[in-house]
Swiss-Prot record:
Organism ancestry: Bacteria, Pseudomonadati, Pseudomonadota, Gammaproteobacteria, Alteromonadales
Membrane topology according to the record: Peripheral membrane protein
Cofactors (names): prenylated FMN; Mn(2+)
Protein name, entry field: 3-octaprenyl-4-hydroxybenzoate carboxy-lyase
UniProt gene name: ubiD
UniProt-listed NCBIfam families: PRK10922.1, UbiD family decarboxylase
Gene Ontology terms describing biological process: ubiquinone biosynthetic process
Length: 488
């Protein structure tokens, strides 16, 4: 299941009943959000608004509104198959030499996939069929959603931002929200630890006072979009990972105004620069926490060129109290995370990010405990191994007899296997999401680890409780007569 571009994916979704075309006039101001929100909560299809009020460009929404569609976007038929994607990433993150001929032969398919990694630069691309520059650029002609009543302005939500630092060979792809500021101005809301912000900081040191080139792709193919939100190893580019998912090299084209490579099949591309020191207050916006966030200053991007396909499609989403698309992406990508964590911590049985925890703020881990203090080691590992979890506020560790995805099981473990003073680990002054207004300082807060495992000698002086369980013989006898009892 491979897609050349977003339009291929739309066609397949429609054939499978996973996409609904809406011909009625719908307003990008609030109405699209309400319709997409109701559709997502009902586990409904992707939506193609063909008649946005006041615009002649259709809007694609709720594209990744179910875990199944996320898996399809990664070239898989089912969410369970994403474990294989995670295993591939784990191998690429820490490759191991084969232990023999048989194992070497077994790795051949992986190396064949690796051949699809290098991006392929093309001279002519669909994303540059129409080129606008200078005064021709008018971002207000795009049907950018105004998602919530208290939002400051329309917000670009699926912009795939392409940057490059002065010391790095490869480009960085990241998805950062962008507030519409004017006909040719947007605010780039990237947090200081994110790849784009780090590239910009390095540029400012190396080229003080010089404009920093940036390109933003809208409506890239699913593999490239998802490559930008997946925990790819630092040595692997997002374009390379997209090639692995797609089974063919990612086609890119040089931007018109700079040397950055953008997805050749993207629907719309914004090109321009950020002038060091040019900042603007961003927000407030309703975000994935379910609240409006604080206003803060972020860099301003001046758009000098806008290129697009003929009859482009604008890809959009909203963020709000879970479930929203980021939460659904988290559920699906959870399956990618598990093998990566297990590669480093083989004792981990399962790892779960409950969507109601705003995608990443709470993690539940089940493990095969092997020694006193083992749960705390796993907690620290989760917080430190992948940068995706540096903002995870709560980590709950349970034994492998607990189902990490069943709250009844987890709550039972917490209330019966934990002593709050002994089994709670608090760490202060750690990086926290800037959108987390509960932290005492913006971007800096605390983390809590909860050891809900059975305690070993050395962790307790008391005789530990033995779980109640009926013997198998009795269960079997009752199974035999259960239907005849006619109780239920």
């Amino acid at each position: 299941m491979k897609y050349k571009d977003l339009r291929d994916f739309i066609d397949l979704l429609e054939k499978r009943g996973e996409l609904k075309r809406i011909t009625q006039e719908i307003d990008p101001y609030l109405e699209m959000t309400e319709i997409a929100d109701r559709t997502l909560r009902a586990k409904g299809p992707a939506l193609l608004f063909e008649n946005p009020k006041g615009y002649d460009i259709p809007v694609l929404a709720n594209l990744f509104g179910t875990p199944k569609r996320v898996a399809m976007g990664m070239g898989q038929e089912d969410v369970s198959e994403l474990r294989e994607v995670g295993k591939l990433l784990a191998f690429l993150k820490e490759p191991e030499p084969p232990k023999g001929i048989k194992e070497a032969l077994g790795q051949i398919p992986v190396y064949k996939q690796v051949l699809n990694m290098p991006a392929k630069e093309v001279k002519k691309a669909p994303c540059q069929e129409v080129i606008l520059q200078g005064d021709e650029v008018d971002l207000t002609k795009l049907p950018i959603q105004h998602c919530w009543p208290g939002d400051a302005a329309p917000l670009i939500t699926w912009g795939l931002t392409v940057t490059k630092g002065p010391y790095k060979k490869r480009q960085n792809l990241g998805i950062y929200r962008q507030q519409l500021l004017g006909k040719n101005k947007i605010i780039m809301r990237w947090l200081s630890h994110r790849g784009g912000a780090l590239d910009f900081q390095e540029w400012c040191k190396e080229n003080p006072g010089q404009p920093y080139p940036v390109s933003v792709a809208l409506g890239a193919d699913p593999a490239t979009i998802l490559g930008a939100v997946t925990p790819v190893p630092d040595t692997l580019s997002e374009y390379a990972f997209a090639g692995l998912l797609r089974g063919s090299k990612t086609e890119v084209v040089k931007s018109i105004s700079n040397d950055l490579q953008v997805p050749a099949s993207a629907e719309i591309v914004l090109e321009g620069y950020i002038m060091p020191g040019e900042m603007a207050p961003e927000g407030p916006y309703g975000d994935h926490t379910g609240y409006y966030n604080e206003v803060d200053d972020f860099p301003v991007m001046t758009v000098t060129h806008m290129t697009h396909r003929k009859n482009p499609i604008y890809h959009s989403t909203f963020t709000g109290r879970p479930p929203d698309e980021p939460a659904i992406l988290g559920v699906a990508l959870n399956e990618v995370f598990v093998p990566i964590l297990q590669k480093q911590f083989p004792e981990i049985v399962d790892f779960y990010l409950p969507p109601e925890g705003c995608s990443y703020r709470m993690a539940i881990v089940t493990m095969k405990k092997q020694y006193p203090g083992h749960a705390k080691r796993v907690m620290m590992g989760v917080w430190s191994y992948l940068r995706q979890f540096m903002y995870t506020k709560f980590v709950i560790v349970c034994d492998d007899d607990i189902n990490a995805r069943d709250w009844e099981d987890v709550i039972w473990a917490i209330t019966t296997r934990m002593d709050p003073a002994r089994d709670t680990t608090l760490i202060e002054n750690t990086p926290i999401d800037y959108l987390d207004f509960a932290s005492p300082v913006s971007g800096l807060g605390s983390k809590m680890g909860m050891d809900a495992t059975n305690k070993w000698p050395g962790e307790t002086n008391r005789e530990w409780g033995e779980p109640i369980e009926m013997d198998k013989a009795t269960k079997d006898r009752v199974d035999d007569i259960w239907q005849s009892l006619n109780i239920l």
